[in-house]
């Protein structure tokens, strides 16, 4: 149901932003007018870029951007961990507005690329990304937040300051700006 909802619809006229490039990036690019996909990990970025280059399909409508973290070297995760609470010991890099400084270039990369009709949040510094959506969209922009329910609402609760809930399918939450 989730794949059908996101990947198998044709959003041919839409301009889409994806924070967190992945194996679905080519599938999305095939179904939209234009895709901006931002990745923080250099090795993963090269893999996605190579996979798209060797494909027989044209991805001229896709702009892949590499934006490594400010701290953490060559695009690997900045290893900060939750110190207490239900997520004690788990990596903290995917959440939290406080990670904006670690991923500033990644979060801010699309600011001159919008407006976008659809925004997909599936990478690092997710709350920081959510906080920028109002600058990147319009009144009808839909925001899809992958794995929103996996860690529990408290993990990403700051997102409700920036986005209005609009439904969900499994672990994919849908919001409006």
Predicted region positions:
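N-terminal start-of-chain detector that recognizes signal peptides
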Residues: 6-11, 36, 91-93, 116-117, ...
């Amino acid at each position: 149901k989730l794949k059908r909802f996101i990947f198998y619809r044709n959003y041919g006229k839409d301009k889409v932003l994806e924070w967190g490039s992945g194996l679905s990036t080519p599938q999305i690019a095939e179904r939209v007018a234009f895709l901006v996909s931002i990745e923080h990990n250099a090795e993963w970025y090269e893999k996605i870029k190579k996979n798209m280059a060797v494909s027989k399909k044209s991805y001229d409508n896709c702009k892949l951007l590499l934006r490594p973290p400010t701290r953490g070297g060559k695009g690997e995760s900045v290893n900060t961990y939750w110190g207490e609470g239900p997520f004690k010991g788990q990596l903290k890099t995917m959440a939290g507005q406080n990670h904006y400084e670690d991923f500033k270039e990644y979060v801010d990369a699309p600011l001159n690329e919008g407006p976008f009709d659809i925004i997909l949040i599936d990478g690092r510094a997710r709350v920081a990304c959510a906080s920028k959506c109002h600058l990147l969209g319009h009144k009808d922009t839909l925001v899809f937040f992958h794995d929103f329910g996996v860690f529990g609402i408290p993990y990403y609760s700051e997102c409700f300051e920036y986005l209005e809930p609009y439904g969900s399918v499994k672990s994919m939450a849908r919001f409006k700006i």
